[in-house]
From Swiss-Prot:
Binding-site list for [4Fe-4S] cluster: C99, C133
Gene3D superfamilies documented for this protein: P-loop containing nucleotide triphosphate hydrolases
NCBIfam families: nifH
Species: Gluconacetobacter diazotrophicus (strain ATCC 49037 / DSM 5601 / CCUG 37298 / CIP 103539 / LMG 7603 / PAl5)
Post-translational changes noted in the entry: The reversible ADP-ribosylation of Arg-102 inactivates the nitrogenase reductase and regulates nitrogenase activity.
The reaction(s) this protein catalyses: N2 + 8 reduced [2Fe-2S]-[ferredoxin] + 16 ATP + 16 H2O = H2 + 8 oxidized [2Fe-2S]-[ferredoxin] + 2 NH4(+) + 16 ADP + 16 phosphate + 6 H(+)
Top-level taxon of origin: Bacteria
UniProt cofactor(s): [4Fe-4S] cluster
Quaternary data: Homodimer.
This protein's name: Nitrogenase iron protein
Underlying gene: nifH
HAMAP family tied to this protein: NifH
EC annotation from Swiss-Prot or TrEMBL: 1.18.6.1
UniProt cofactor note: Binds 1 [4Fe-4S] cluster per dimer.
GO MF term (any one): ATP binding
Length: 298
């Protein structure tokens, strides 16, 4: 059996990280790979499309019902989805109470101790990336995830989050084996999006693994709680996810130690690509607008 690959998808909330990861993993399982998904997002939506169901019960909620994690069996928390993909959601506490990352730590330890990682080719962690706090950084910090894929777009906050995640990877890259596998751009149809994503990837000493075009069929599939791979296997969008899966499969050992940039450098990049206006441009536009309004009144 091939060496276990532990990958993680990180990204800003709402970027389409869980959708992208589940479609990619559905394509990987079609390639004959055995997969375990460990959802590390408090929304617990990392496995919904694979299971064709509402969010599955989380390790933390089941442990609370049973008394403790020690009272659980592996089959209590592990569900089997599309083409045999194993699914677990770590979960998080009630909003405003406790550390959401605690569920990640508890879950990974429980899964390892109970043999969930046996007989799989890939373990995939789906992780919230707005905050790289101790708990959410756990797959990186504890040397679990070896390849990190950052899902982003051409929007400023997605770029900012991607750079922050790169900082988190760098922090643990030298003490462990974690590497940045690359960036995955989920198209939002912003100006010069591909160029900007590609430029950021290069600045981070990485690469743009794939540019996933925006397509309504993704939402159609999601409404039916399915991946595009399952819902419309012959569609162009399913082909995009298969291409992404092939690229990730071929990317073993290709990860890099990232070189995060400063906020000033990020803003300079946005100015360079015309995404952010300089003060001079903004003032010139305002003056032109006022002149036009004055002419209309004259």
């Amino acid at each position: 059996m091939s060496k276990l690959r532990q990958i993680a998808f990180y990204g800003k909330g709402g970027i389409g990280k869980s959708t992208t990861s589940q479609n990619t993993l559905a394509a990987l399982v079609e390639m004959g790979q055995k997969i375990l998904i460990v959802g590390c997002d408090p929304k617990a939506d990392s496995t919904r499309l694979i299971l064709n169901a509402k969010a599955q019960d989380t390790v933390l909620s089941l442990a609370a019902e049973a008394g403790s994690v020690e009272d659980l069996e592996l089959e209590d928390v592990l569900k089997i989805g599309y083409k045999g993909i194993k699914c677990v959601e770590s979960g998080g506490p009630e909003p405003g109470v406790g550390c959401a990352g605690r569920g990640v730590i508890t879950s990974i330890n429980f899964l390892e101790e109970n043999g969930a990682y046996d007989d799989v080719d890939y373990v995939s962690y789906d992780v919230l990336g707005d905050v790289v706090c101790g708990g959410f950084a756990m797959p990186i910090r504890e040397n679990k995830a070896q390849e990190i894929y950052i899902v982003m777009s051409g929007e400023m906050m997605a770029l900012y989050a991607a750079n922050n995640i790169a900082k988190g990877i760098l922090k643990y890259a030298h003490s462990g084996g974690v590497r940045l596998g690359g960036l995955i751009c989920n198209e939002r149809q912003t100006d010069r999006e591909y160029d900007l994503a590609d430029a950021l990837a290069k600045r981070l000493n990485s690469k743009l693994v794939h540019f996933v075009p925006r397509a309504n069929i993704v939402q159609h599939a999601e409404l039916r709680k399915q991946t595009v791979i399952e819902y419309a296997p012959d569609s162009a969008q399913a082909g995009e996810y298969r291409t992404l899966a092939q690229k990730i499969h071929a990317n073993s050992g290709q990860g890099t130690v990232p070189t995060p940039i400063t906020m000033e450098e990020l803003e300079d990049m946005l100015l360079e690509f015309g995404i952010m206006k300089t003060d001079e441009q903004a003032l010139a536009e305002l003056a032109a607008k006022e002149a036009k309004a004055a002419a209309a009144l004259a």
